[in-house]
Amino acid sequence: MFQKVRKQRFEHREKIQGKYINILEGHELHTDVFSESEQRGIVDYVFYLRDLGRAGRLRKRTYSEPQKWMRGKRRITIQCGCCYNFTYDNEGNPPGIIRHDEMALIPTIIKRMIQKMVLWHVLSANCVPNSCIINIYEKGDCIPPHIDHHDFLRPSSTISFISECNILFGSDLQTIGPGEFRGSAEIPLPLGSVLVLKGNGADLVRHCIPGVPRRRVSITFRKMDDSKAPFGYRPDPDLEGLRPLEL
C-alpha cells in the first residue's frame, strides 16, 4: 500500500540576484508508486496510442511525430485534456494552451494513475491534474531547457517508464551540443517514480531532459488554469471529488 512509497526532497543552492537560493525547493521524488505490472500495462497502452497516431486515427495536435530524425530533435508526443504549443506554430498560435482546438479525453488507464497518486498522498486533492502529455523517446531524444508555461498551475508531475534518466536544473542551463546540456543540479528519475515539480524548481530555474541513453517513456500531468482551458472544456467526473486515503 501507499505506506511503502518513499518521498525525497532536494537542496542545491545557487546565487540568484545576489541571494543564495535553493533552486530545488518544492521538488519531491516519490518512489515505488507504480508496480512493475502497472508499468507494463501503461507502457503497452502508450504504444497502442502511438500506433493509432501513426495510422492517422488520433487528432492532428493530439499526436505529433517529427518526420525526420536528428539527434536532440525527435520526440513523439501524445496530448490529452488539452493541446498546447511549445513555441509559435505555423498558424501563428503562441506558446501555451490552444483554446479553440477540440481536445482528446484522458484515457481511463491514465485517469487511474491520477486517482492513485491522489489516494496515495503523492498529489494534492486541491490540484488534481486535468491534462497530460505522453513523451516517447528513442536514444538521443531530449527535452530542451524550459520553464513550464503558466497556463498550467503548479505543481506538475512526471512519471518515468522503460528506462531511467536524470532531469537537469539550473539558473544558467547551457546547450553544449545536440541533446547535450550543462546545468548545476540533477535529480534521478527511477522507474515507476513520480517527480512533483513546484516552488523555486518549477518557476525560478529551467529544467531539461538531456539526450536519453535508450528508449524511454514519460507521462507528465498538469492542471490547467481555469481561465486558460479550451473553450467547451468540461471537468471529468472521474477526477472530481478525489480524496487521499487516511494515514
Give the role of each language-model region:
Residues 1-247:
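Non-heme Fe(II) oxygenase metal-center motifs and adjacent flexible, charged/small-residue loops
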